[in-house]
Amino acid sequence: MGVALFDSNILIDYLNGIKAAEKELTRYSHKAISIITWMEIIAGTYEPELATVKEWLLEFNIKTIDSKIAERAATIRREKRIRLPDAIIWATAQVGSMLLVSRNTKDFPATEVGVRVPYQL
């Protein structure tokens, strides 16, 4: 399989012990997250788990925002009317030719090419 870019909700589910998230993460040998996802996970994590979570996040290829991602995110934001952080995550997947794995069907419909919604809670 290609590279999967995971949305924050899949990682949060994993950290909360959701088995479907654990199963989804094991499907891919090449895993990535946007720097936005990294920030969202770190912002929601407190001591004493912070160091462990930071170490775990190093298992992912962390994608930063460059001018191509920024431009694509602006277009997605304008066309889809979604929040900028979600537009950046989606743009990161598109620009990098990655599969976006999320359960956020409001912003990332499963019918969109390049989007995978593996489970619902």
Question: Each predicted region: which residue ranges?
Answer:
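Conserved acidic donor-binding loop of glycosyltransferase catalytic domains
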Residues: 103
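Asp-based phosphoryl-transfer active-site loop
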Residues: 4-13
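Flexible glycine-rich beta->alpha loop in the catalytic core of nucleotide-sugar glycosyltransferases
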Residues: 106
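PIN-domain endoribonuclease scaffold, especially VapC-family toxins
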Residues: 2-4, 20-84, 88-99, 109-114, ...
